[in-house]
Amino acid sequence: MSLYFRPEKAVLGDVIPYYDNGVFKPFYLRNYRANRDEQHQDSWVMLSTTDHIHYTEHDTKIVGGTGSVIKVDGLYHMFYCTFQKLPEKNYMNHAVSTDLDVWMEIPEDRFASDDVIYEPIHWRDPFVFWSEEENCWWMIFAAQKKGKTTRRGCVGLCKSKDLHHWDYCEPFYAPMNAQCAFECPDFFRMGDWYYLVFSSYADRYQTMYRKSRSP
């Protein structure tokens, strides 16, 4: 028994926390790297645990980058990113499930950057949540804003009424002080403060946060 979970023959990346019906069910990105073959393919994997010592793996068969999972009216929604090489371009993707084990991708919900507000390459890591203030869904994500300066790293923003059709909005957070996209953003309220958490891969790899009295 090990205190820390480690996948067999693979590396673990970008844990996506989730809690459902009394059970912790974090997802992670499984990457086989040198061990990749027909039987070992990269994918999102869900772990189930009640004590954070004993884990059961559930392969979702979803292939893609970091994202988030929410539950709406009994249906689970997964949002994640995928990467196109030629021409280089990233996409946001949507899948649904009734049990967190079997997922159905929705190809028609896939969408790329508008290439007006945001660059098409740095467009990933969607985090979706309900905005009480605006009565709609918000998606924040790692992005680079279009512009002449190189310091265009930001947390982007899209909004939706139905989780299927998204409107492009100006960045949620864009200090214009870093070239890198602000990765794996998370947003939550604690007490009277709203917190935005994200990671940076510039000259120093670090996790940072910003807080505000309003979203």
Show which residues each predicted segment covers:
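Beta-rich carbohydrate-recognition and catalytic domains
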Residues: M1-D125, F129-F182, R189-P215
